[in-house]
Amino acid sequence: MPSMDIVSEVNEVELRNAVDNTKRELATRFDFRGKTADVEYKDHVVTLTAEDDFQCQQLVDILRMQLSKRNVDPSSMEVDEKAIHSGKTFSLKVKFKEGIETLIAKKLVKLIKDSKLKVQASIQGEKVRVTGKKRDDLQAVMALARESELGQPFQFDNFKD
């Protein structure tokens, strides 16, 4: 019986490359010339530091653009609502969603069951296991998960026939 896992992961290598590209672009941007601005990556958290709040938002936009260039879904980003002001710099923390939260997993399972496809979906920790009789049913579930607006990107792992 074919089965697959629906997971939500961020490719760490591509994330680090996107942060490095953001640093490079920061060094060449005219509007950041002569300003104090920095991008730091540590433990799935990117810290953006700039002289004012507007520049922090520009850094978020640059990071989003670099992530999409590196094929990392920017919807996995969780940006702090308000920049933290300390001294003469503002800093924003950007976290990346890893794993599927139980609430989103329940919504995904309900969405799959409401689609009337002949598959079974079960929550297993931070992933959703889907089994069915036909490979076509699993591919339909993949399309359904991609189209769903649950606020989190999904990847498909462990596809077995």
Curated annotation (Swiss-Prot):
A GO molecular-function annotation: nucleotide binding
InterPro entries per UniProt: DUF520, UPF0234-like_C, UPF0234_N, YajQ-like_sf
GO CC terms of this entry: cytosol
Task performed by this protein: Nucleotide-binding protein.
Cell membrane keyword on record: no
Name of this protein: Nucleotide-binding protein Sbal_0710
Lineage summary: Bacteria, Pseudomonadati, Pseudomonadota, Gammaproteobacteria, Alteromonadales
Keyword set includes Amino-acid biosynthesis: no
Family the UniProt entry places it in: Belongs to the YajQ family.
Keywords: Nucleotide-binding
NCBIfam families in the cross-refs: PRK05412.1 (NF003819)
